[in-house]
Every structure is written in C-alpha cells, then in structure tokens.
Amino acid sequence: MRRALLVIDMLEDFVAEGGALRVPDAAAVLPRIVEEVADARRRGEPVVYVCDAHTPGDPEFSRMGWPPHAVRGTPGARVVPSLAPGPYDPVVEKTTYSGFHGSRLDAVLRERLVDTLRLTGCVTNICVLYTAADAAMRGYAVEVVEDAVAGLDPRDHEWALRQVQEVLGGRIVGRQ
C-alpha cells in the first residue's frame, strides 16, 4: 500500500475570517490537518495540495450561485500559511468540485505509485465528497479523516461521511 495525503481547498478564501466563501469549521480543523501533514511527511508519504482555482468571471460563480472565490493571483487563492506546501509537494489546481475532473491529480498520484488516499480539508459534502467519489471510481482506496474535514453545516458534513463509507466503500478514520 502506498498512501498519499490530500489537502483539499485549505485556501484563504475558505478558511480566513472574511474569506469570500468562508467555511465555518475550516479554521477549527486546521490544527488537525497540520498534524496530518507532519505525520505523512514523517512516514515518507506524498502530501498533495488540491486547490480550487478560478479565473475572474468564472461561469461557476453565476451557474452555481457562489460568490467569486479562489481567483488565481488573489490572496484568497493562497494555501493558508500554516499549511504552506513544501518544495516537493505537488499543488494541483482544480476548477470544479472534484480534484480529479480536468486536472492532473490522477497522473500525479500514479507517478508516485499511490493506491490509497487520505483526505483532509473542506468542504466535506462538496469538494471532499466529489474527490472521494472520483477516487473510488478510479480504483483508489479512500480514507477521510473525520476530524480533519469541515462542512458548511454539521448535518451535511455527517451525511457526506456516511456517503463515503456506505456508498463509496471508503473508511472514516481518525488519528493514526
């Protein structure tokens, strides 16, 4: 088994006070994600950053009703400082909910011979769930770190965790 840690959308616009699309619990799970990153690095596992990245006026904003967020080149599109990628950590941009759709994520993982993904970040019921679903459809084993993901509300967060486990066959895990 070769596992990689995915850090999904831990960007200023989702985490910081006043962020364009702030996720209420994202700052609360930040310390756990910092621990997960340190643990993965200690074990020699790849840490891959999966980051929402939009252009100004991206159709997603009007089509989905989201405010402009994670616009390339803006402070809101940056990974929060306490999780800054290391020099060898891949940063994969995505333009929609799934980290796989239209991105190089699958290639990055296959190059590193990864077969298991440990997911952290936000939003549990959106980008984390869609990335988990696409990972499962591609044959990856999926683990979601329950206390290192944040949803927009607790009900949706819990629903998404159940979907990962009951529908996708993934594992909901805690600290190692």
Language-model-detected regions and their locations in the chain:
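Active-site flanking residues adjacent to catalytic metal/cofactor-binding acidic residues
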Residues: 8, 51, 146
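Short, glycine/acidic-enriched loop or turn micro-motifs at the edges of active sites
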Residues: 12, 16, 150
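Short catalytic helix/loop segments, enriched in acidic residues and glycine
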Residues: 23-35
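Short glycine-enriched, charge-decorated loop/helix-capping segments at active-site entrances
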Residues: 19-26, 64-70
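Metal-dependent catalytic neighborhoods of phosphoester/phosphodiester hydrolases
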Residues: 58-63
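Active-site-adjacent betaalpha module
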Residues: 1-4, 32-43, 67-176
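Acidic-leg catalytic submotif of subtilisin-like serine proteases
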Residues: 4-11
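Short beta-strand segments at enzyme active-site cores
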Residues: 45-52
